From Swiss-Prot:
PROSITE patterns: RIBOSOMAL_S13_1, RIBOSOMAL_S13_2. Residues 140-150 have a biased composition (Basic residues). It comes from Methanosarcina barkeri (strain Fusaro / DSM 804). Part of the 30S ribosomal subunit. Forms a loose heterodimer with protein S19. Forms two bridges to the 50S subunit in the 70S ribosome. Located at the top of the head of the 30S subunit, it contacts several helices of the 16S rRNA. In the 70S ribosome it contacts the 23S rRNA (bridge B1a) and protein L5 of the 50S subunit (bridge B1b), connecting the 2 subunits; these bridges are implicated in subunit movement. One of its GO terms (biological process) is translation. Keywords: Ribonucleoprotein, Ribosomal protein, RNA-binding, rRNA-binding. One of its GO terms (cellular component) is small ribosomal subunit. This is Small ribosomal subunit protein uS13. GO terms for molecular function: rRNA binding; structural constituent of ribosome.
Amino acid sequence: MLYTFPWREYMVEEKNNEEIRHLVRIMNTDLKGAKPVEYALTGLPGIGRRTAILIAKGAGVDPTATLGYLPDEEVAKLDRAIGNFEGIVPSWMLNRQKDLATGQDKHLLGTDILLTFREDINNLKKVRAYRGLRHERGLKVRGQRTKSTGRRGSTVGVSRRK
């Protein structure tokens, strides 16, 4: 069977003696078993393609292998490698560097990312920082121009003279 991705095609061979697992559970998330490991792991919030490839190589699993055909031992290796991701990569690759509360470098996964992000924005609002005020008012935060773009609401048309 041929799976086409925008940048690459993968041939997934049908194995007669083995049945594919269509859902594989890793880190309390159901991942699609028909995809290669490097793409299936991106279903976890906090893991992109680059980190997925590093996790697969760190676990000793082929990144292009189909996730649904992997034995349970290799899936467990992937699970352990995701939990130990901070030990595999340098600190500049982690998504939470110098945490405000602890000062440690972490890699957040799953709902922890959303909760931490929301908490950071609320802290900015609480201390009345410039970025927090922009978030409160619903304006652009990162220095973009706002004269003509970023407008919301219905447009006001121009009436023509008769």
